[in-house]
């Protein structure tokens, strides 16, 4: 559900302070964060964030297309494990063939 327009976008204040400090000094360092729910603002473009996925930190380089999305959208929390093809073929084959 979208956030109310009168409230504005949510950005963790400490994260915003770190980005502002890096923008003033023109540095490009990786910013480590647990704040997956912070919305990406135009100030974040060009920075790399290490977003925690519950197990490890995933590096996310922010581009202009990501503005308005949340940081957590780009650091998946679940790993997809495929079904092995041999087991799938066994299930499809009918007994007696």
Curated annotation (Swiss-Prot):
Coiled-coil intervals, chain numbering: none
GO biological process: ribosomal small subunit assembly; translation
Organism: Salinibacter ruber (strain DSM 13855 / M31)
Name of the encoding gene: rpsS
Role played: Protein S19 forms a complex with S13 that binds strongly to the 16S ribosomal RNA.
Protein known as: Small ribosomal subunit protein uS19
Family: Belongs to the universal ribosomal protein uS19 family.
InterPro entries for the chain: Ribosomal_uS19, Ribosomal_uS19_bac-type, Ribosomal_uS19_CS, Ribosomal_uS19_SF
GO CC annotations, alphabetized: cytoplasm; small ribosomal subunit
Pfam families to which the protein is assigned, alphabetical: Ribosomal_S19
This protein's UniProt keywords: Ribonucleoprotein, Ribosomal protein, RNA-binding, rRNA-binding
Molecular function GO terms recorded: rRNA binding; structural constituent of ribosome
């Amino acid at each position: 559900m979208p956030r109310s327009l009168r409230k504005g976008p949510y950005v963790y204040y400490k994260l915003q302070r770190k980005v502002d400090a890096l923008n003033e000094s023109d540095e490009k360092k990786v910013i480590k964060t647990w704040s997956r729910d912070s919305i990406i603002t135009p100030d974040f473009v060009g920075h790399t964030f290490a977003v925690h996925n519950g197990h490890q930190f995933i590096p996310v380089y922010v581009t202009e297309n990501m503005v308005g999305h949340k940081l957590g959208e780009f650091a998946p929390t679940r790993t997809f494990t495929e079904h092995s093809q041999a087991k799938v073929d066994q299930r499809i084959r009918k007994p007696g063939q």
